[in-house]
Amino acid sequence: VQHAGTEYSTVPDVQQTGNAHALMDSGLFDFVYNHHTHSIQPIEPYNGKFIAYGTGNGISESAPYENRVNNEFLLLRIQFAKQADGTWTTNDLAWAPATNLQNGGYKWCSVASDAPQGVCQSPDFDADVRERTRATVNAMGAEGAGVHELLLTQDPPLPVVAPAESAG
């Protein structure tokens, strides 16, 4: 995880991309996650792996319209798979767009295409957030590399693995 970037920008800056590429080029990481900008930023496919530059504000109060990206969030589901040679790879990366409710309270609300809880603000508002998120996430080629929207009512939940009993 790196804490870098220009606040409220939907485009990663030189510090973010330089640091993320250096981390990936080290060979020590299979996924790099960035936060700090309080805005959704692209997911970049990089040498067969992925960099998530910004997931917005998962915990937020409403921002004024000029900083509306501060009211938008991105939930990521990253599924890793162990390969036969013992290395790990990202075998599925999905995103779900979300916003807070601005009409009197702050509440996480998915604006995913399948609208699992119904309309957050209005059909037009929700669609605007969703499409702005889609365009931003895919701005560096994520969709072409298999990254997709997480449809909360259609994608099966990942299995829950119970912790092993401690011997003692």
Predicted regions and their residues:
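Short acidic, glycine-rich surface-loop motifs adjacent to enzyme active sites
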Residues: V1-V11
